[in-house]
Every structure is written in structure tokens, then in C-alpha cells.
Amino acid sequence: MPAIHDFACTTKTSRGWPAHAGHDGDEGTEAHADLLKENTMSDTAAIPNRAKKGVGLSGVTAGNTALCTVGRTGNDLHYRGYDILDVAEQCEFEEIAYLLVHGALPTTAELTGYKAKLRALRGLPAAVKRTLEALPAASHPMDVMRTAVSAIGCVLPEKDDQNQPGARDIADRLMACLGSALLYWFHYAHNGKRIDVETDDDSIGGHFLHLLHGKPPSDAFVRAMHTSLILYAEHEFNASTFTCRVVAGTAADMYSAITAGIGALRGPKHGGANEVSFEIQSRYATPDEAEADIRRRIANREVVIGFGHAVYTIADPRNKVIK
């Protein structure tokens, strides 16, 4: 592991950086792609059995991961041993993507090469563009991304041997081009425009904003995208990750696993909960109206979407940053 001063992300907080980028016993070299391909990792992210009453399979260890731990102290989140609060506002998203996919924070030289690789993967095959053009404007963005992954998997399929370097390349490609796919569909479906999806922007977040607005974004907007993408890059053994691993466990290809994971994330009891929460908030015309309705819901013992978490018993550590 290189010295910390050689990393592109050099800020060291008062908490300090761990000597090793993984947990105790973590080899620190397994990638996100490996997590989909293998059921044996060197460390477990499962909290010792703390079953909760009436919460399905709560307390049952479902598998192992070296990538991420959630809520071990009630309000913490770590990526390969790094505290999310140490990296969210200091690192670029590409650094954290490299950490998760390739096993360690990149050096400055490695980051430069990685960014160049991701820029080269932003384009979309013609067949994928035609598929996106066939989708109606009323399509949900999550459905568009699910379809895009499936289409890319048909045009650029994974090798039959499902080797790990190839799986990592697929992970990099999807990170680089899913924003391109979503915004190509958006502009075509809503404005009839076939946009050029290959920009010279230095980051995935900057590229997305450039395609969305049709012009290079400000540094402040790019920084906000870096922070947001980092905060939500990984979250241990959630429903979509579990879905991916079930599909990969049948020896299905990487694209099938990711497509299934997006389908799980689409659900209102997983990633879709954010959308439900936003829709509820949009109903209120004034703060007083919101307070009255929330109090009514609490009095009726109704679920108030957007509050609480099944794992974080104290608070979600991402909140203080994203606010």
C-alpha cells in the first residue's frame, strides 16, 4: 500500500487514516466485481447477530464482504476501512470508485490513468442508442438504466470465463456510461435530440451535469456531485447487493446481476423510498400543514417515510455531510 502522501486524496483528519485500507484480516485486494462473483471474502461485514423482533431475517448472517461496514457503532460507515466522514468532502468520486473496485486508494498517477480510462468508456454503442430511443418519455429513470445495462450486456457481453479483470472492466464501463445512457434517453425522449455523450469533463459527476444542462458545470456543482456520489457509493449488504449476489451465485453474467440489482433498488422499500418520501413532502403547501399531517401519522402509528434506519441506531452519518 503506497504512503498516504502519495495518494491523490491527501487530506488527513484528526481521526487519522488507518494503516490498512481494509478491516482486520481483509486482504484489501478484492473488488466490487469479486463481491458479485464470489461468496467467500476475507472479512465479514455482518454485525454479530442482533435480531430485531418481527424484522424478517434480521440477525441472520447472509454472506461476507470486505468492501463496507455499516452501523457497527450505531452511526458509522466505512469503505474498506476508511471512515466516510474522512473522505466524503476531501476525495473525488473516482478515487473512491477505484478504492471499491480495485482495492485501494489510487496514487496520483493511478488516478490520472483511471480518469482517462473512464473518459474513454463514456460512449454508447449504436445498438444501445437505438434501444434507448425506443423507450417512451414516461419511462422511469431506473427502468431506463436497467434497460441500458441489459442492452450493453447484449452488445458487449462478458467473457465466458467470467474473469475478475474483465468483471472490473465492466464495473468501470457501467460507471462511466450509465449517465450517458440516461441523459441520451432523456434528451431524445423529451426533446427529440440525439446528443453527443462523449465530453472532456474530468469527472463522472461533471460529465453528468454537462450532459444534463448542455454546458460545462461550475466547480461548486462538480464538488457537490463528488460528495453525493461518494456518500451513496456503497452500503454493505442491502437488498440490491443481496440480489446481485444471488444472481451471480447462479454463475450468471455480470450484466444480469447488475440488472437484477437495479430492479431491487427500484422498489419502494429500498431505493424507491427516497422517491416516495419526496412525493409526500411535495403534498404540503406550508410547514404547518406538514407538521399537522406528520403528527397525525405518528398518532395513528403510521410509517413516516424518510425517518429512521434499520441499521443506524443513532443517526445516519451521511446526513451531516449531505445537508
Q: Which residues does each PLM region occupy?
A:
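Hydrophobic alpha-helical bundle cores within soluble ligand-binding/oligomerization subdomains
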Residues: 42-323
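A cross-taxon signal for low-complexity, glycine/charged-rich
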Residues: 1-4, 8-14, 19-33
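Short intrinsically disordered terminal tails
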Residues: 37-38
